[in-house]
Curated annotation (Swiss-Prot):
Lineage of the species this protein comes from: Eukaryota, Viridiplantae, Streptophyta, Embryophyta, Tracheophyta
Recorded family membership: Belongs to the universal ribosomal protein uS2 family.
Organism: Nandina domestica (Heavenly bamboo)
Keywords annotated in UniProt: Chloroplast, Plastid, Ribonucleoprotein, Ribosomal protein
Location in the cell: Plastid, Chloroplast
InterPro entries with a match to the protein in the record: Ribosomal_uS2, Ribosomal_uS2_bac/mit/plastid, Ribosomal_uS2_CS, Ribosomal_uS2_flav_dom_sf
PANTHER family: 30S RIBOSOMAL PROTEIN S2 PROKARYOTIC AND ORGANELLAR, SMALL RIBOSOMAL SUBUNIT PROTEIN US2M
Record-given protein name: Small ribosomal subunit protein uS2c
UniProt GO cellular component terms: chloroplast; mitochondrial small ribosomal subunit
HAMAP family registered for this protein in UniProt: Ribosomal_uS2_B (MF_00291_B)
């Protein structure tokens, strides 16, 4: 895998608050190598190491995208949801930003069945079939469609398991991470000072609570994906 330059600026990371960790009482000792200081009861992440791992992650996703691989971005907490959706749409990735339904990847056949149902209902709505049904039946189908749109809207075009999964908050998305580990799907994970750096394939030490920090990391990753996709299209 070729190493590339991704213009990861330490000052910009500081402005985005990437370096702010959790309180010193709420930490995982395995994060010690990624912490540079304590300040007013808060752990400060070593941004040089953050930049190194973010650069590695960008190299990985660029390489994968240049070979036509598929990505899934997962981040369901309120602070991450909008950034996850906009980043995924920009890079033409799949995403989950409301709730990870248990077994979404490990029980893929069930997810696939739900996706087929979702697509069928969308098609029926577009053709106006709902309008020709009794009100009660139409209302029931609309509720089903709304529910499926909420939880599966970001993966509606997914036809198989993703090649790489990007996870915004390790603790919040622990179920998703464990499913990826079980299936051997490579993972890139933002990890705050209360996380375990050994669970993901590439762990990026960063503030996973601040919107600006989440957006900074995702922007770098999706820029690399977009470059990789352009390379893939040129070389086809």
């Amino acid at each position: 895998m070729t190493r590339r330059y991704w213009n990861i600026n330490l000052e910009e990371m500081m402005e985005a608050g990437v370096h702010f960790g959790h309180g010193t009482r709420k930490w995982n000792p395995r994060m010690a190598p990624y912490i540079s200081a304590k300040r007013k009861g808060i752990h400060i992440t070593n941004l040089t190491r953050t930049a190194r791992f973010l650069s590695e992650a960008c190299d990985l996703v660029f390489d994968a995208a240049s070979r036509g691989k598929q990505f899934l971005i997962v981040g369901t907490k309120n602070k991450a949801a909008d950034s996850v959706a906009s980043a995924a749409i920009r890079a033409r990735c799949h995403y989950v930003n409301k709730k990870w339904l248990g077994g979404m990847s490990t029980n893929w056949s069930t997810t696939e069945t739900r996706l087929h149902k979702f697509r069928d209902l969308r098609a029926e709505q577009k053709t106006g079939r709902f309008n020709r049904l009794p009100k009660r039946d139409a209302a029931m189908l609309k509720r089903q469609l709304s529910h499926l749109q909420t939880y599966l809207g970001g993966i509606k075009y997914m036809t198989g398991l993703p090649d790489i999964v990007i996870i915004v908050d390790q603790q919040e998305e622990y179920t998703a991470l464990r499913e990826c580990v079980t299936l051997g799907i490579p993972t890139i994970c933002l990890i705050d000072t209360n996380c375990d750096p050994d669970l993901a394939d590439i762990s990026i030490p960063a503030n996973d609570d601040a919107i600006a920090s989440i957006r900074f990391i995702l922007n770098k990753l999706v820029s690399a994906i977009c470059e990789g996709r352009s390379s893939y299209i040129r070389n086809r």
